[in-house]
Amino acid sequence: MYEKTIEPVAIMHTGFGEKFGIPRQSGLVPEAAGQIIFEPKYRNPDALRGIEEFTHLWIIWGFSENRVEKFTPLVTPPRLGGREKRGVFATRSPFRPNGMGLSSVRLDKVEYKSSKGPIIHVSGVDMLDGTPIYDIKPYLAYADSHPKASDGFAAEHRWDTVHVIWRDEALKSCMDEDTRITVEHILAQDPRAAYNKARDYIYGMRYGRFDIRFVADSHAGTIEIVDVVECVDGYHKVK
């Protein structure tokens, strides 16, 4: 049997310091930014020659925080509420034999004049900060876009976005406008697990240097941000 050992060519840096809050798919939060910083041996501008002719990229990456000890053929997709099982190869579950992820992101710019350059700036990411990147390829609309494709069970169990409200105290934080909009769009996707919809519970989500604390009302379809704490001396998760 042919086997191949692969190594990361780059590391993705994002505002997602923990798994909770990461969009379930790439592109759901267009404002979620990331920077691809190459490993030293791959920091050659020639490797990116022509990449700026494209608007989107495919990123092949690894679920570095998941440790799959043995093959599990059935998984419980979040979209099915954690109650129904599907075959692992019929889902995008992170619990996979080789732990590989695939994301389509927007190419915003390439920064060549940097000590760690070239750096690729992208948006619409769904990756944890520090995620290993194994390959990068251009997105080709004529080949990669399939308008008549079927979404399978995902079409019948779509996620409904929720309305995000800010308390006055939370609005007084030092969060800039761009970050505020990004946080709103992240929370509008309702990052809570399908089995954890407790009302009046204070959730904590980290994005960038901020700890965002919120409560949710599933019946009203709202999430209310109650406090924003800047993480100066490390991150202290709300429990």
Language-model regions: role of each:
Residues G17, K109-I120, H219:
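Short, conserved beta-turn/loop elements at beta-strand boundaries and strand-helix junctions
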Residues G15, V110-K113, V125, I136, ...:
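Residue-level recognition of beta-strand microenvironments
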Residues I120-A154:
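Flexible glycine-rich active-site/ligand-binding loops centered on an Asp-His dyad
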Residues M1-P45, I51-E53, A141-H185, A194, ...:
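Arg/Lys-rich, positively charged N-terminal/basic patches that mediate binding to nucleic acids
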Residues A198-S218:
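Basic/aromatic recognition patch in beta-strand/loop cores that engages polyanionic ligands
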Residues Y2-P8, F95-V105, G208:
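Short coil-to-beta-strand transition motifs
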Residues D217-K239:
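Enriched for short, Lys/Arg-rich terminal
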Residues A47-G101, Y195-R199:
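Active-site-adjacent substructure of cysteine-protease-like catalytic cores
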